[in-house]
């Protein structure tokens, strides 16, 4: 039996399974890679919102990461909810040491419910500590506005934001996601690399059940990079994956429910491996 590719997620929890490391691990599995996880925060949340957040002391994150890296190196890693500057600095230390491992950053600032998931000090230091090491960053429109400091309301401003990520912040790639745009029919994502710009379009589905879409999207990109896929191929797969997961949402919970992390595997299978 061939040894599987390994993807590591560093993020918070979701007891209902829709977001955070729970969503990441399901997405890794659906992409055919072995998932590992290091927890940053214990989050009491459900489809109705966030009830409580307990951020772990940063040394607990360092202990978990050392447990992973001293035993088996991941082929790619991603970060989601990183609550503090101290945690960012620990992650940066590993990114510097293992700079050949692809790194995907989902710059999670708010939950779908609107609850804040990152303190102000962490927000202020995100682009200095972690984003310069990103193989691909995956901000939605509000996150891209927060990071770049510009208002994004048309294609020109999207290109301006992409240029800031690549040429000023130093990320190798960035996907600016269009899920928060006013387009009611199409969801368009823009991938900026150091050489090119690509667009990815999928239908927009009329559903409130989109909890964990950002986590899932970035996890699929991470899984594909772990398998050695290009940025373009990884994002293309993630876009189709998230579109199908929204189309076939299981409608779980009383509020904004999760997506279906296994819809792609059931509809397309693993025939692209």
Language-model segments: which ranges?
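Conserved N-terminal subdomain of the carbohydrate kinase-like
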Residues: 2-9, 29-112, 268
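N-terminal phosphate-binding or glycine-rich loops at protein starts, especially the Walker A/P-loop
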Residues: 6-30
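Short, small-residue alpha-helix embedded
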Residues: 22, 146, 207-231
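Phosphate-handling active-site elements
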Residues: 32-36, 197-198, 224-237
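Charged C-terminal helix
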Residues: 55, 232-273
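Conserved phosphate/ATP/ADP-binding segment of small-molecule kinases
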Residues: 120-196
